[in-house]
């Protein structure tokens, strides 16, 4: 391992959401394990949560042959500002401040002997590639959904095929290299009636800048989405590097990106027989209505299965009410049920006691399930989840479908919940799903070991970053300082207070 200052330095900028931070931090750890110095940054409002919940510090942490370090920046708003929950307000604010502060951070790193050679961002903040271009640095982007969803958004953005519209709400969508998607299997942010148009705008914003990154990294693997990846690689410079949550060069690294401390539930799982526990978690952003929560609770009770259920409290500014369990639920469940606020999901899915995963089908959870050989009960709600559910159930054949998503506007009854749990844990279909899940686990493991498809792609990316770093060093002694215009913008947009807090200038 080289010294920190001698390593090629990449700078990762993350949108401050749990589903964005985790995969980008996982990529950072993989890059560090390949011998790079990685700096990870996101707004300080999230940095505080990460310091509290995860094992991160201000000192560079060794990972494999390299290091990872953290720097956070103020987004110009007070810590308790509720407008962060409104992306239409927060994304412009983040861009305004980020375009000022990120160049300053990069310049400071150069002055301290850590010149940056590449910037990498995830979706919702495509302006990072503008910053890189201004500084004369190459940039890359990590796509945090499936390649199938990337291709769907690409075709929608460029108007290449018909999608559901106000005049044709229920048309099916045929995309190249993909199975026919029913209208409610298309990423739901593309529906004309989506209640989340701001998320459609946020995702499609990346496609406006898609020609600037020299590489689009994807948290998937060649064997999983082979035909789609082959097609997409002809129109965009993609490299599959997943599953990112596995890091063979640093399997025991304790650096995590969680915003909440996980509750201790592994000891409870240890006390249960093999393949006897249903794991229920709907991720970090999905919140169901109370009546649906009640039906799931009674379905779990009536099924007779052991269960571990994650009930994450909503953000205080989200507008959601805290969900409650039916009266007497925990007493009736007894020791066969455990309810927690957050879990160490990777460990839970890898535990021999876990039989199946009731999931919202977000891509992070989908990849973790497939890589762990875990069958799923698909409970998608919106966004890419409905497309992921289509693939998990119909294409990868590792799941039972419990619902079709929020657009269905249908209460899933306790009887349906019970039936799906039994189907996923008992009988011939459960055995077939487990067999298929183990097949995908083997394929995933083969992709990230040394010489596997994802490992080769990641190494090729690292080699390209190093090559470009040599070119940058040869062309100038240090990273280009922020242009005068950017510095002037800094003076007009933000003020740094005596306590280090950055605020919008009056």
Curated annotation (Swiss-Prot):
Its EC number is 2.4.1.136, 2.4.1.120, 2.4.1.170, 2.4.1.177. CDD domains: GT1_Gtf-like. Expressed in roots of the seedlings. An anthocyanidin binds at residues 20, 383. Keywords: Cytoplasm, Glycosyltransferase, Transferase. UDP-alpha-D-glucose binds at residues 345, 360, 363-365, 368, 384-385. The keyword Electron transport does not apply. Activity remains fairly constant between 20-55 degrees Celsius. Active even at 0 degrees Celsius. Glucosyltransferase that catalyzes the formation of 1-O-beta-D-glucose esters with hydroxybenzoic acids and cinnamic acid including its derivatives as preferred glucosyl acceptors. Has significant activity with gallic acid (3,4,5-trihydroxybenzoic acid), 3,4-dihydroxybenzoic acid, 4-hydroxybenzoic acid, cinnamic acid, sinapic acid, coumaric acid, caffeic acid and ferulic acid in vitro. Belongs to the UDP-glycosyltransferase family. This is Gallate 1-beta-glucosyltransferase 84A23.
């Amino acid at each position: 391992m080289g010294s920190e200052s001698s390593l090629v330095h990449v700078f990762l900028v993350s949108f401050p959401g749990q589903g964005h931070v985790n995969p980008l931090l996982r990529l950072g750890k993989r890059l560090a394990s390949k011998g790079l110095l990685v700096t990870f940054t996101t707004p300080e409002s999230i940095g505080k949560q990460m310091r509290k919940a995860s094992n991160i510090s201000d000192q560079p942490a060794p990972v494999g042959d390299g290091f990872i370090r953290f720097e956070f920046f103020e987004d110009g708003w007070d810590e308790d500002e509720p407008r962060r929950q409104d992306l239409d307000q927060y994304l412009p604010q983040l861009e305004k401040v980020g375009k000022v502060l990120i160049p300053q951070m990069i310049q400071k790193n150069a002055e301290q002997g850590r010149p940056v050679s590449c910037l990498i961002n995830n979706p919702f903040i495509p302006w990072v590639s503008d910053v890189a271009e201004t500084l004369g640095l190459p940039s890359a982007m990590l796509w945090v959904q499936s390649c199938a969803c990337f291709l769907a958004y690409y075709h929608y953005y460029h108007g290449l095929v018909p999608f559901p519209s106000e005049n044709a709400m229920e048309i099916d969508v045929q995309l190249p290299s993909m199975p026919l998607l029913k209208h409610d299997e298309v990423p739901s942010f593309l529906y004309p009636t989506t209640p989340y148009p701001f998320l459609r705008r946020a995702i499609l914003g990346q496609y406006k800048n898609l020609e600037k990154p020299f590489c689009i990294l994807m948290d998937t693997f060649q064997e999983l989405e082979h035909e789609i990846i082959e097609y997409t690689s002809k129109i965009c410079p993609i490299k599959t590097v997943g599953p990112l949550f596995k890091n063979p060069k640093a399997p025991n690294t304790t650096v995590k990106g969680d915003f909440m401390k996980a509750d201790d539930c592994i000891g409870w799982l240890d006390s249960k027989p093999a393949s006897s526990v249903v794991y229920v978690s709907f991720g970090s952003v999905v919140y169901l209505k109370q009546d649906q929560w009640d039906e799931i609770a009674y379905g779990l009770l009536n099924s007779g299965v052991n269960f571990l259920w994650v009930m994450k409290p909503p953000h205080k500014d989200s507008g959601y009410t805290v969900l409650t369990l039916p009266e007497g639920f925990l007493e009736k469940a007894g020791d066969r049920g455990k309810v927690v606020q957050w879990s160490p999901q990777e460990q839970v899915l890898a535990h021999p006691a876990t039989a199946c995963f009731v999931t919202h089908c977000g891509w992070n959870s989908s990849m973790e399930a497939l890589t762990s050989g875990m069958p799923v009960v698909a409970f998608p709600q919106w966004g890419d989840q409905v497309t992921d559910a289509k693939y998990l159930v119909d294409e990868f054949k590792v799941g039972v479908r419990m619902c079709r998503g929020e657009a269905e506007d249908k209460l899933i009854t306790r009887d349906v919940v019970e039936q799906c749990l039994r189907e996923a844990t008992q009988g011939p279909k459960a055995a077939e799903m487990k067999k298929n899940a183990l097949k995908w686990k083997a394929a995933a493991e083969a992709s990230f070991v040394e010489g596997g498809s994802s490992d080769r792609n990641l190494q090729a990316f690292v080699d390209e970053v190093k090559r470009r770093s040599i070119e940058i060093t040869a062309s100038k002694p240090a990273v280009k300082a922020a242009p005068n215009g950017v510095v002037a913008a800094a003076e007009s947009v933000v003020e740094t207070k005596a306590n280090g807090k950055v605020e919008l200038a009056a």
